[in-house]
Amino acid sequence: MKKKIIISLISIIILTIPLFILVQNNLENSDEIIAKESLITYQSNLEEKFKIDGYTIDNPNIILDPYDASPLTALVLFETNDEVEPTITIVGKDELTTYTYESKKSNKHYLPIYGLYADYENTIIIEYGDVRKEITIKTNPLPDNFILPTSIKADKEKLSNDLYFFTPSSRGYTCAYDTNGDVRWYLTNYAIWNINKLKNGHMLVSTERLINAPYYMTGLYEIDMFGKIYNEYSLEGGYHHDYYEMPNGNLLVASDNFNSDEGTVEDYIVEIDRQNGNIVKKFDLKSILNMEDGKSENWSSYDWFHNNAVWYDDKTNSITLSGRHQDAVINISYETGNLNWIIGDSTNWSSEYQKYFFKPVGDNFE
């Protein structure tokens, strides 16, 4: 029995719909908006190639990298007389790297093909009813500057046929590897920090544009596995490190307030309304914590907290954040922004914050 593909999204710092752009109302740089609308228009124009009339399973329309953004993907288009539900198999080098999934029932078929090998004659099997069609898709090599794993270790008895997604924290490619360490998906557009699957099946990645050095990006793209952009969320304070999709669909985003009097970074959280792109809530950590407390080795007055994680807990209606430069994990109320608790070493913290620290219990703590 063929396994269904399970796509596991892993983010390392160490999937026709109208196209539109959601931008923050007070974004000042209109040139950036125009530039990105042009890219979305470019992708929309590419859909003119997605012709299906007259194509059959014996002579399908095969489009490699349909949105010019994800070279190891393809689109296979054809018509059938009756409504059928095709099964697609991307043949791998073994069972764990072979992916099988079903398409929707229709007589007009736009079959997404994900997980091709680079520089390879990929075999794709399409089946429905008594029909079995085998097609070959030849891909191009990886870019010369694509950094590959130097050592691969896998306990395959404990693995399933997943794709494992990676993002860089600086330069590199957002990509996915199979259990053999072969690249099976990547984006040509520069995207860093987090990558997660949204509830609607799309993914969220950074834009490719810097708003401030060294790694503060202008915002986030909502994309699918083709790299097709559905929405852009632009932020006046940019985006870095992490975001979280809330139960209502809004996004909590690690951001910055570049206009603050203190001139600090990585101490600001915003909530984006997914329907219109507006900022509906802000959390300024400077009003919650003492900037001079809990200094780690890399602490500076400019980057005093260095928030690198955002998490929302629905049960307690609270937000958990990770401050590398204060060596602390903190939790605040979503409603009020008040501090709830701190995990870390309380030694170098002011007396007013001592009551918020959890007390270690047991022999495992020093």
Name each model-derived stretch.
Residues L22-S30, G129:
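Beta-rich interaction/scaffold domains
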